[in-house]
């Protein structure tokens, strides 16, 4: 992507505001990884569909970034944020009122599109000053992680009291708060301009890298924790414990993101991404060798660093 020199350079304010939109928008997605695997029957689906639904939002992002990038050339980040806030609210509400795989799949695909849009909005504000792109992305990731951290710690308790589906109706209402925040963003913003106007660009190796990270850490790791606990305890205990463990990842992510962003600006995000990936591989190796605490900690720390470093790496490449 090429950026015009005439585009405005923003301070940290719009970046943090856009991250706040994401913090509310992502509430339903954060909790569904804990609730859905052990409550599949309540949603009218089988465990087979659990895997599909939790992966659908990531897969669609790979093939829609081209169209979204073209859309971003025509409208401001503020308008994109409003669209993303509306989409995420509808998606979360659908997870609460829908039953069966068809509507749930539509909800997850809608969330994937909304997440891609909001990520692009944060990116557009954060990299307006390329010298501080990593730092800005680090702070935005910290704000972005507040909502998921809280919902993973409190949400499982609420799901037990309200029911595994009703909790998403309440989360949908809370997610609606992202809309007024989106309206606070600057009316004119830095628009992303693509080098090639391709609607469906061929996924690059870095795109596949991010997909693998998402499927292994956010998918298999998160689902595996919850299902493993459910085998030896109750569903409620599995949700609470799984939520606490995944919530810890979010808390560490929020804590490490500013540091990771600053280090990325100083040493280069590509080097730190390599180190983080090696740490991630080490973590999974330790997990398979029956060292769950050390292995899980390595996975959590590596995932937190990758989360903040990949946008800075994209900014460096464009």
How should these model regions be labeled?
Residues 64-76, 256-268:
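Helix-to-loop junctions at the C-terminal end of transmembrane segments
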Residues 10-38, 202-221, 297:
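Pair of pore-lining "gating" transmembrane helices in MFS-fold secondary transporters
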Residues 79-93, 172, 271-286:
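Structural signature of the two symmetry-related core transmembrane helices
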Residues 44, 76, 97-102, 268, ...:
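Helix-breaking motifs and short loop linkers at transmembrane-helix boundaries and internal kinks
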Residues 34-48, 223-241:
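Short amphipathic helix-loop junctions that connect adjacent transmembrane helices
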Residues 91, 102-110, 294-302:
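Paired small-residue
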